[in-house]
């Protein structure tokens, strides 16, 4: 009989089919409905041949995917740092307010802050070029923000018209239906938090369920350029001794990251060979002697920009990035990846890139330094970015922000799985 080859593509770290909203009336906090079985899970269970797709392209700033990569993908996604990698693009705002747990299950303070930010961005000729998406934990909070925005559209019909004509209009979605969507800027309303008496429940609706961490992973990986988290809840108010939910533990870690911009990264993802480190340090030292600020091994995944030269006129950005023929070369399977694709991706993220060969450095250091100086002098400057709505955290990938690292253990499936199924025709 003939055999047909089938490819099943999916990500077991994100949402499988769900029956969460199969009922017309759902109590999100107390629902015990489960995710449905997926064909992908069946393929994994019987150990079919698999191929992992590791390159990540959506996020134009590495901080936007850094938490998911570390927490859920075991740092196996290959991500690329951007030229302004010194500042995190995940920020957090804590509005003054509370979560109305007993009655409406709404958080009006967060909803108001989200809608105000939408109107502010749509009213700015430059900011309105970035598309906007709103993500909420619950459908109740989603509906509240939707209603508030409709009221604002009525007061600003010209802004509603601009949004209507946009190729990517504003969307407002919850955890259950945002998968597959993306926008330049994501505004994330947590919703849950202290009630009017200041008491915090450890019930976060669908996040508490088995697999709730998948919902969090979906929610925090929708942004291309920036993510602003709105939360009356602070990470220290989440008591993990009162819950065993992986989703709640993930939320606590993400709120800490949004506040501090720091991640705990496993040692294997940042280790470089001694010879590579020596060459990198020698070149970096020589550049420092020219009077420039320098940072080495930039990036939170396996891929690194070996040396970044900080712009003396804007210390939040790199003026030039240098790639050496070391670890990055070993991690690239083809010459096209090394010499075409990687520099192309970095150029698209705003980098000015110069490649330096180790043998050239040992052969004629002065000539290589001259080439570096010429590249610095000719590097185009980047436009100053608009001041964000909240002070961004300094982005680092070298420190733990909690005493116990167990809360940051990786999940149990591999990322981006492609399985082959052989089907015999009867």
Predicted ranges, named:
Residues 182, 195-200, 330-338, 364:
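Active-site-adjacent loop/helix micro-motif of nuclease/hydrolase catalytic cores
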Residues 290, 295-297, 342, 348, ...:
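Catalytic cores of nucleotide-enabled group-transfer and carboxylate-activating enzymes in metabolic
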Residues 213-227, 339-354:
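Metal-dependent nuclease catalytic cores in nucleic-acid-processing enzymes
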Residues 1-282, 296-299:
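Conserved helicase motor core of SF1/SF2 NTP-dependent helicases
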Residues 286-318:
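Active-site metal-binding core of divalent-cation-utilizing nuclease and nuclease-like domains
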Residues 3-4, 421-425:
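Short, small-residue-biased leader/transition segments that mark boundaries at the very start
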Residues 308-344, 361:
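Short beta-strand-loop-alpha-helix junction that forms the active-site gateway
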Residues 347-412:
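Basic, glycine-rich
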């Amino acid at each position: 009989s003939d055999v047909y080859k089938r490819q099943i593509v999916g990500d077991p770290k994100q949402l499988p089919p769900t029956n969460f909203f199969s009922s017309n009336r759902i109590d999100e906090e107390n629902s015990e409905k489960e995710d449905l079985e997926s064909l992908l899970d069946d393929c994994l269970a019987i150990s079919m041949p698999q191929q992992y797709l590791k390159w990540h392209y959506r996020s134009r700033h590495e901080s936007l995917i850094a938490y998911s990569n570390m927490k859920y993908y075991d740092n196996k996604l290959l991500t690329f740092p951007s030229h302004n990698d010194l500042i995190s693009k995940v920020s957090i705002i804590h509005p003054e307010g509370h979560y109305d747990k007993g009655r409406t299950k709404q958080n009006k303070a967060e909803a108001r802050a989200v809608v105000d930010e939408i109107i502010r961005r749509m009213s700015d000729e430059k900011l309105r070029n970035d598309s906007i998406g709103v993500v909420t934990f619950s459908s109740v909070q989603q509906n509240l923000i939707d209603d508030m925005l409709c009221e604002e559209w009525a007061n600003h019909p010209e802004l509603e018209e601009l949004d209507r004509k946009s190729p990517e209009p504003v969307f407002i979605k919850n955890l259950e239906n945002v998968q597959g969507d993306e926008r330049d800027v994501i505004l994330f309303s947590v919703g849950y938090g202290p009630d009017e008496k200041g008491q915090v429940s450890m019930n976060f609706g669908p996040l508490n369920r088995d697999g709730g961490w998948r919902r969090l992973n979906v929610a925090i990986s929708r942004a291309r350029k920036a993510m602003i988290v709105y939360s009356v809840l602070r990470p220290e108010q989440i008591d993990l001794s009162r819950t065993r939910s992986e989703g709640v533990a993930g939320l606590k870690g993400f709120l800490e990251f949004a506040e501090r911009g720091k991640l705990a990264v496993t040692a294997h993802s940042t280790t470089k060979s001694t010879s590579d480190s020596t060459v990198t340090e020698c070149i970096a030292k020589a550049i420092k002697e020219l009077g420039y600020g320098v940072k080495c091994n930039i990036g939170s995944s396996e891929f690194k920009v070996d040396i970044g030269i900080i712009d003396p006129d804007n210390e939040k950005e790199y003026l030039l990035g240098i790639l050496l023929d070391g670890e990055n070369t070993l991690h690239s399977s083809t010459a096209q990846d090394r010499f075409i694709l990687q520099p192309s991706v970095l150029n698209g993220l705003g980098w000015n890139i110069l490649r330096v060969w180790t043998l050239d450095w040992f052969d004629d250091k002065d000539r290589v330094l001259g080439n570096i100086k010429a590249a610095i002098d000719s590097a185009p400057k980047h436009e100053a970015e608009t001041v964000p709505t909240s002070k961004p955290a300094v982005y680092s990938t070298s420190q733990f922000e909690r005493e116990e690292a167990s809360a940051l253990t990786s999940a149990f499936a591999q990322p981006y799985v492609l399985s082959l199924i052989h089907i015999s025709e009867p």
